[in-house]
């Protein structure tokens, strides 16, 4: 039996070190799998998502797009700020964790890291009204995507604004970094669209 953590976002995912195995696993896991040819006109860059990338990451991203595709179309994804979308994701996920996971935590009192425990405390304070407001924002966001993106569109953008953090940073610093990364990683989950994450670029310190 699989127990939910956050049913709005819990989904099947898998890892692979190469494209061939990624495809094979997809054919196993996904029903009615059909291969389709991706046309370049359907590959889009969401300018509002990448506007505040680290300069080095942004430069590598645009250089890669120019080398690989040439002249990809740029689109405005949404009227919402990335921070609003990330907060929306956190509230929905946090409230559902509050219902699904916190009762077990309270009952068995397992040993949990300080950083994870702080997220559980945050989840405990999320109200039903906050959750409903976030669900409504998510619906409006998806509606915007349906209007702004042509059918069969594929968005391409980095899922982190900078290189991986250096080890040894404080919990507070890591929490702020994680909030910023969430602005990029929440898009797939909030939009209910599949995503593929590929480690592609390196930052100033040559960290992935």
Task: Walk through the language-model features, giving the residues of each.
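Generic secondary-structure signature for well-ordered alpha-helical cores
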Residues: 20, 27-35, 66, 70, ...
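Short helix-loop capping/hinge segments that flank enzyme active sites or metal/cofactor-binding pockets
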Residues: 88-137, 199-207
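Acyltransferase
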Residues: 58-75, 102-107, 130-152
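Glycine-rich, small-residue loops and helix-cap segments
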Residues: 132-208
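Residue-level signal for inorganic ion chemistry
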Residues: 22, 101, 156
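Fold-level recognition of mixed alpha/beta catalytic cores in primary-metabolism enzymes, strongest
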Residues: 1-46
């Amino acid at each position: 039996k699989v127990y939910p953590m956050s049913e709005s976002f819990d989904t099947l995912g898998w890892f692979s070190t190469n494209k061939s195995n990624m495809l094979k696993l997809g054919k196993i896991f996904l029903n009615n799998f059909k291969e389709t040819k991706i046309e370049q006109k359907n590959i889009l860059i969401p300018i509002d998502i990448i506007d505040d990338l680290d300069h080095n990451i942004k430069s590598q991203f645009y250089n890669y797009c120019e080398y690989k595709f040439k002249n990809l179309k740029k689109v405005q994804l949404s009227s919402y700020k990335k921070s609003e979308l990330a907060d929306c994701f956190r509230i929905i996920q946090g409230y559902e964790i509050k219902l699904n996971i916190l009762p077990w935590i309270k009952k068995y009192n397992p040993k949990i890291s300080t950083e994870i425990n702080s997220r559980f405390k945050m989840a405990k304070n999320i109200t039903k009204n906050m959750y409903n407001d976030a669900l409504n924002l998510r619906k409006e966001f998806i509606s915007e995507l349906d209007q702004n993106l042509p059918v069969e569109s594929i968005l391409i953008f980095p899922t982190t604004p900078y290189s991986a953090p250096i080890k040894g940073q404080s919990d507070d610093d890591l929490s702020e970094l994680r909030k910023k990364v969430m602005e990029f990683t929440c898009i797939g989950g909030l939009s209910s669209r599949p995503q593929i994450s590929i480690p592609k670029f390196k930052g100033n310190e040559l960290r992935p």
